[in-house]
Regions:
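Beta-rich accessory regions
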Residues: 1-152
């Protein structure tokens, strides 16, 4: 199809320690993988690294208007704001998958098996360790990851 895809190696699945249905979570260890499914003609917003007020890393999947937006403006300590705190990319209005990795201060988002990719750094506050489904009905799987090392 003339597109360049970027996707993690299959061996990353070896890091999966637990598997549960994707849902709101009050607390995580901030080391996890999400495999999400979004229906065509849908709009969903999730907040990762979320605190009790729902502030964190916002990901808005707007398939109706053909756009995915990542907003880190409420995800902990801010830096490099002169370069902006949001990133967007166009996306087709079709059934869509998103594989998301959170590793404390790093996020990676792979849309449709790597057709579109977001990577970034955030520095969440200590209480920003939840997951919030803010709107829509994304479905999928939550995997807690274990790197075999102690995390803070």
């Amino acid at each position: 199809d003339g597109k360049l895809y970027q996707y993690p190696v299959a061996a990353i699945k070896d890091l999966r320690a637990t598997e549960e249905a994707f849902s709101n979570r009050v607390q995580t260890k901030n080391t996890y993988e999400l495999e999400l499914n979004l229906e065509a003609n849908s709009q969903s917003e999730i907040v990762l690294l979320a605190d009790q007020e729902g502030q964190g890393l916002s990901i808005n999947f707007d398939l109706v208007n053909g756009q995915v937006t990542v907003d880190r403006s409420q995800a902990g300590e801010q830096y490099a704001q002169e370069f902006g705190t949001t990133r967007s990319c166009p996306i087709d209005n079709q059934a869509t998958t998103a594989t998301i990795f959170i590793d404390n201060s790093v996020f990676e988002i792979f849309i449709n098996k790597g057709e579109k990719v977001f990577s970034g750094r955030v520095f969440p506050h200590a209480d920003q360790n939840g997951i919030l489904i803010k709107s829509g009905n994304p479905t999928g799987t939550y995997y807690e990851l274990d790197y075999g090392r102690k995390t803070n």
